[in-house]
Amino acid sequence: MQEEVSRYQALAASYDELTVDVGYLRRADYLERQFRKSPVPVRTVLDLACGTGTMACLLAKRGYEVTATDASEEMLTQAMTKAAALTERPPLFLHQTMPRLRLLEPVVAAICTLEAVTYLTRPADLQETFRRVFRWLRPGGWFLFDVNTPWKLRRMDRQIYMDETEESLCVWRTFFSEKRQTCTYQVDLFRQRADGAWDRSFEEHRERAWTEEELRQALAEAGFTAVKLTGDLTSRPPKPTEDRWIITAQRPVE
């Protein structure tokens, strides 16, 4: 049986199995190193586009008060199931898109990991997301996010990737549009049912190849300062062949 659904619905149940090589612990360690550099002590954190909540739960286990948002109800269901096993204070999960961010109270740090910002394909949505993050950061607070680089997304044009687990098979077909500066992922997911039969679902994802100049301009227009762009999990400038950029920016102290 084949069914077409919107992004991160069918994939939600298999997402953790398909991303076992992400290295969440290393990324959490990196985030904490950045938090320690902040002149404002970081205790409250926003995890924007949190997915299945792995990073949000890791930070909660380390003592942070975490608010986590995502646009996919299915991903949030997985996240809340994961958080239910915590002995520490669990994250507060909110069902929101990035450009419609609205929190209960400001935070000292905001993160957006695993290239979620590249899912913002329209300049207006990118600008509004940055504006809202700025609005919900305390003065002196920090925004840290990563993106897939234009070099990586162009290199993915007309490629086929496969991920396989015991109960699922995921096939990704990718196409890059120079005109739109976007990479489209056509995803076929096959999941085995208890009776041995297989269900097939289709999702289409799209990411924008934002340039460094576009990101810096959008951050500046939102009010951010001290913008820094580095390679992945490092303090050095990115290489020309970098797959991922990490960007940090600060809301000025008022």
Protein language model regions, located:
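A short glycine-rich, Lys/Arg-flanked "PGG" loop and its adjoining helix->strand segment in the class I
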Residues: 127-139
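Conserved class I S-adenosyl-L-methionine
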Residues: 1-49
